[in-house]
């Protein structure tokens, strides 16, 4: 199973398809220019991942995602959009998306996100995930209230740990030592009143930052 790109701009589809094909060792990449075309293509051949834009002619990317997930709950959708307002990010996740990227994301981040979502994980671009953690979600439980007591760096470490990022990679990406990451983990468990990594993941899901894999 390959990837289906859903975007109404042919040049964006062409460039992204070429980039992903090279970066993912020739994984097949198909294209759709509208929500209706995406629904038809998925019906004909199930992809491993749908990369979705918000703005589409006809039915929107959000509505397309809802329809796809209603028909195929196991289908994984990653939003790739120039619109990064937190309300829209939450709408995408509520519609069933497994991740969200801005079109301004670095190429390496795009590849990482696609690989992680294909592997069954959730992925929200780091700046967006941090903003989501800091802003309460109407109707959510107490997850966000606890997170608001964290510093910016603690939120970054928390989100990376919750997404399953190895300690070594967290240290590299944040330019700190592995020992410092371990210290942050101990501090986070104390501040958030959890005792295990599984509870950290549960808290991230409760706060609306991660979705349970379908």
Curated annotation (Swiss-Prot):
Keywords tagged on the record: DNA-binding, Phosphoprotein, Transcription, Transcription regulation
Inducing or repressing factors: Up-regulated by AgmR but the exaE promoter is down-regulated in the presence of a combination of glucose and ethanol.
Pfam families, per the entry: GerE (PF00196), Response_reg (PF00072)
Domain of life according to the entry: Bacteria
DNA-binding region ranges: 167-186
All residue ranges annotated as the Response regulatory domain in the record: 2-118
Keyword DNA-binding carried by entry: yes
An annotated Gene Ontology molecular function: DNA binding
Keyword Transcription regulation: yes
Residues recorded as bearing 4-aspartylphosphate in the entry: 53
SMART domains: HTH_LUXR, REC
Cystine pairings recorded for this chain: none
Chain ranges of the HTH luxR-type domain: 143-208
GO terms under biological process: phosphorelay signal transduction system; regulation of DNA-templated transcription
InterPro entries: CheY-like_superfamily, Sig_transdc_resp-reg_C-effctor, Sig_transdc_resp-reg_receiver, Tscrpt_reg_LuxR_C, WalR-like
Function: Positive regulator of the expression of the gene qedA and the activity of ADH I but does not affect the activities of ADH IIB or ADH IIG.
Record protein name field: Transcriptional activator protein ExaE
Organism: Pseudomonas putida (Arthrobacter siderocapsulatus)
Lineage of the species this protein comes from: Bacteria, Pseudomonadati, Pseudomonadota, Gammaproteobacteria, Pseudomonadales
Gene: exaE
């Amino acid at each position: 199973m390959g990837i289906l790109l859903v975007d109404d701009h042919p040049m964006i589809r062409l460039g992204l398809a070429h980039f992903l094909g090279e970066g993912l060792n020739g994984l097949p990449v198909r294209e759709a220019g509208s929500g209706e075309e995406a629904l038809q293509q998925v019906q004909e051949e199930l992809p491993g991942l749908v990369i979705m834009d918000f703005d589409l002619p006809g039915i929107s990317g959000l509505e397309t995602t809802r329809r796809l997930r209603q028909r195929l709950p196991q289908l994984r959708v990653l939003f790739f959009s120039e619109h990064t307002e937190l309300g829209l990010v939450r709408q995408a996740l509520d519609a069933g998306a497994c991740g969200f990227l801005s079109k301004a994301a670095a190429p390496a981040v795009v590849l990482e996100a696609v690989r992680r979502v294909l592997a069954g994980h959730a992925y929200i671009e780091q700046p967006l995930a941090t903003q989501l953690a800091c802003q309460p979600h109407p109707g959510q439980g107490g997850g966000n209230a606890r997170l608001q007591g964290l510093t910016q760096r603690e939120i970054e470490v928390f989100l990376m740990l919750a997404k399953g990022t190895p300690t070594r990679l967290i240290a590299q990406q944040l330019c700190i030592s592995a020992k410092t990451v371990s210290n942050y983990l101990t501090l986070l468990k104390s501040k958030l009143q959890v005792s295990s990594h599984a509870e950290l993941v549960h808290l991230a899901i409760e706060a609306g930052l991660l979705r349970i894999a379908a």
